[in-house]
């Protein structure tokens, strides 16, 4: 974690970060918080802590000249470096993996210059990759290549974008697995008393994403108004081969920021959890990890429950107890299927799950909405006068 402090300037808080660059030289970076000094100290301190945790020290720029002789593989690396400061750390980690492990090795081996790159070269690359990965992965490769070449056009290295002329693979239709109400009850029972209890409970009932469950803090729970606010996430990224924990006061999209009702059974369990954490903190004393104070999903000594722990231990929990294998994310699908089965309109499910638009919800869960099809069939029977027939 880099060093940093708050600085007041023109009645606003600024974050000042101090770090050593790739050459070992001490650097200082100022960032505006947009928070006025008056009554915003705690918010500013929280932002400071987040930036200190997530700040990535800029690496030395690659010694690659942007000219007519640049290889396409080298240009992709240069673009990756340029785009690093404009995107979230988790997005950069995803880009880096695709560019450095897949795209660059393929094109470097072929020695194709940027100015000589043709649509057929890209099409050959996609065809080759489809032999080993699914179409959705190739679509992601295409998206990165297209963005990089768009940048090349912008800075006048090439006149047109060859990726515009490529046929993108058709996206795979995905249907998530889901548990029935009985299976959910069985799962919550076997998870009780384990580190997965709270993640399983909240993901099943509220349909929360893994990042949203692990990002829940006590200040997002209002026990008086009985509300639960989804506004913070915890994710993990692999940067330069190292696993980095990312904590951020934001969710996937604006619609992901939502407030949900805190129902009595969940409220009671969270109050119990709060009491347990207070007890553990007193018993452990100085041994308790105070870095993650305020988070719901921590263990007995205060260590945060990491995303990879949930993904690795969840299938083991199912297998150990003889439950049908599903992914942790499928608890979100299970929540949606139960809502649909109980007559909740798709629009309300969209808002409950925090999808950015209605089409996202409809595309994912329309195959589950059989009840509405029966209703439509019945309406047609009655409309066409088929007597007492029923669908």
Where are these regions (language model features)?
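C-terminal secondary-structure termini that scaffold catalytic or DNA-interacting sites
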Residues: 225, 236-257, 264-266, 272, ...
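N-terminal core-binding DNA-recognition domain of tyrosine site-specific recombinases/integrases
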Residues: 39-40, 80-157, 173, 304-309, ...
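Short, basic (Lys/Arg/His-rich) helix/loop patches that form interaction surfaces
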Residues: 189, 193-196, 206, 260, ...
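Short functional hotspots where side chains directly engage DNA or cofactors
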Residues: 113, 164-165, 225-231, 327, ...
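DNA/chromatin major-groove-contacting recognition/catalytic segments
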Residues: 186, 190-192, 239-246, 342, ...
């Amino acid at each position: 974690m880099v060093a940093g402090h708050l600085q007041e300037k023109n009645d606003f808080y600024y974050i000042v970060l101090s770090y050593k660059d790739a050459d070992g030289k001490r650097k200082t970076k100022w960032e505006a918080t947009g928070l006025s000094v008056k009554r915003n100290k705690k918010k500013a301190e929280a932002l400071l802590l987040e930036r200190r945790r997530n700040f990535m020290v800029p690496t030395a720029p690659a010694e690659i000249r942007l000219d007519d002789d640049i290889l396409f593989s080298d240009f992709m690396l240069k673009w990756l470096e340029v785009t690093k400061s404009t995107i979230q750390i988790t997005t950069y980690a995803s880009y880096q993996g695709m560019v450095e492990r897949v795209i660059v090795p393929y094109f470097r081996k072929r020695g194709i210059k940027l100015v000589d790159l043709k649509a057929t070269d890209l099409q050959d690359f996609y065809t080759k990759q489809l032999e080993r990965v699914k179409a959705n992965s190739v679509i992601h490769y295409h998206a990165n290549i297209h963005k990089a070449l768009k940048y090349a056009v912008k800075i006048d290295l090439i006149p047109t974008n060859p990726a515009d002329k490529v046929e993108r693979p058709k996206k795979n239709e995905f249907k998530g697995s889901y548990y029935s109400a009985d299976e959910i009850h069985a799962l919550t029972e076997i998870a009780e008393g384990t580190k997965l209890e709270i993640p399983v409970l909240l993901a099943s009932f509220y349909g929360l994403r893994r990042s949203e469950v692990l990002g829940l803090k006590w200040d997002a729970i209002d026990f008086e108004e009985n509300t639960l606010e989804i506004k913070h996430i915890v994710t993990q990224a692999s940067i330069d081969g190292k696993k980095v924990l990312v904590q951020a006061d934001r969710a996937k999209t604006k619609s992901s920021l939502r407030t949900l009702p805190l129902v009595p059974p969940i409220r009671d369990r969270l109050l119990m959890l709060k009491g347990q954490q207070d007890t553990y903190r007193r018993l452990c004393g100085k041994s308790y990890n105070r870095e993650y104070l305020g988070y719901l999903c921590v263990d007995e000594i205060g260590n945060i429950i990491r995303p990879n722990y949930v993904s690795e231990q969840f299938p083991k929990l199912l297998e150990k107890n003889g439950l049908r294998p599903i992914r942790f994310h499928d608890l979100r699908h299970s929540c949606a299927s139960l809502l649909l089965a109980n007559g909740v309109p798709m629009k309300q499910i969209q808002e409950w799950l925090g999808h950015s638009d209605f089409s996202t919800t409809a595309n994912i869960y329309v195959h589950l909405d059989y009840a509405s099809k029966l209703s439509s069939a019945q309406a047609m029977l009655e409309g066409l006068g088929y007597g007492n027939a029923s669908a």
